[in-house]
C-alpha cells in the first residue's frame, strides 16, 4: 500500500531518533507502523483512535501540530502503546505532508520543546 502522505524530518528530529534508536532497537519499524496506524488513520481516513492529540496554540488553517502519545515500541516489552515515547509532527493540509519535529522518551523529558515547534512554524 502506498502512502498518501509525504514524510519529512527536521535535523533535530533525526538527532533525537538516532539517540533513541541506540536505546530502543525497534524504533525504525515502530515509526513505520505509527505512520499507518496513527497518522494516516487520523488525517486521511479521519479515524480517531485516541493516539494523536493536536497541540493547542500551534495549529493554523495550513498546519496542524500534533503529538503521538500512544506509540507502541516493541523494544519496551509489555508496555504496549504506553511506551512513554512521544512524537511531535506537523501536518500540512495543502500538500498532505508530515514533518517530524521531535521525538522524546517521557522518562527523560516531561513535555515537548515548545520553542523548537515555534521555530519550525516560523521557518515553514
Describe the predicted segments one by one.
Residues 88-92:
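Short conserved beta-strand segments at catalytic cores or DNA/RNA-binding microdomains
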Residues 82-87:
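Short, surface-exposed coil-to-beta transition loops
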Residues 1-81, 94-98, 106-124:
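Basic, Lys/Arg-enriched alpha-helical interface segments
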Amino acid at each position: 500500500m502506498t502512502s498518501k502522505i509525504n514524510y519529512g524530518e527536521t535535523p533535530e528530529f533525526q538527532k533525537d531518533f538516532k539517540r533513541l534508536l541506540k536505546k530502543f532497537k525497534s524504533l525504525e519499524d515502530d515509526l513505520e507502523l505509527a505512520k499507518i496506524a496513527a497518522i494516516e488513520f487520523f488525517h486521511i481516513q479521519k479515524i480517531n483512535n485516541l493516539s494523536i492529540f493536536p497541540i493547542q496554540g500551534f495549529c493554523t488553517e495550513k498546519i496542524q501540530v500534533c503529538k503521538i502519545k500512544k506509540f507502541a515500541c516493541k523494544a519496551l516489552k509489555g508496555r504496549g502503546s504506553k511506551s512513554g515515547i512521544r512524537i511531535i509532527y506537523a501536518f500540512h493540509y495543502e500538500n498532505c505532508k508530515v514533518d517530524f519535529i521531535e521525538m522524546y522518551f517521557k522518562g527523560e523529558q516531561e513535555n515537548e520543546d515548545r520553542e523548537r515547534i515555534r521555530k519550525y512554524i516560523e521557518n515553514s
